[in-house]
Amino acid sequence: MRTKLLELVEKDQIRTDLPEIREGYNVKVHVRIKEGNKERIQVFEGLVIASYGTGINKSITVRKDSYGVGVERIFKLNSPLIAHIEVTRINKVRRAKLYYMRDLKGKSARLKEIKKAK
């Protein structure tokens, strides 16, 4: 249950520079990595298989295959560590959670593209 006071406070804190992100989108998440006193940007590109939360607590799970090994990472969308997010492809899906993609490999892991992202 969300109170009106909580929504009022969150409205000022929430990021508005991010695009709409849903399950089935292929995204590039640009993450700030701090190593010692240096900071760099690392890109994590993959498929959004789940999203949870609302408002300031919204987060997404992004999955990619790296050298034959599946890698999943959870991102809080309002984190200051996220520089920006690009939507690279919009796929047609009929589920809210795409956990079945974990078991699929090769051609069976393809999704039908709806349209190119801008």
UniProtKB/Swiss-Prot annotation:
Keyword check for Metal-binding: no
Signal peptide: none
InterPro entries the UniProt entry points to: Ribosomal_bL19 (IPR001857), Ribosomal_bL19_CS (IPR018257), Ribosomal_bL19_sf (IPR038657), Translation_prot_SH3-like_sf (IPR008991)
A biological-process GO annotation: translation
SUPFAM superfamilies tied to this protein: Translation proteins SH3-like domain
Assigned keywords, A-Z: Ribonucleoprotein, Ribosomal protein
Record PANTHER family: LARGE RIBOSOMAL SUBUNIT PROTEIN BL19M (PTHR15680:SF9), RIBOSOMAL PROTEIN L19 (PTHR15680)
NCBIfam families according to UniProt: rplS_bact (TIGR01024)
Job of this protein: This protein is located at the 30S-50S ribosomal subunit interface and may play a role in the structure and function of the aminoacyl-tRNA binding site.
Protein name: Large ribosomal subunit protein bL19
Taxonomic source organism: Metamycoplasma arthritidis (strain 158L3-1)
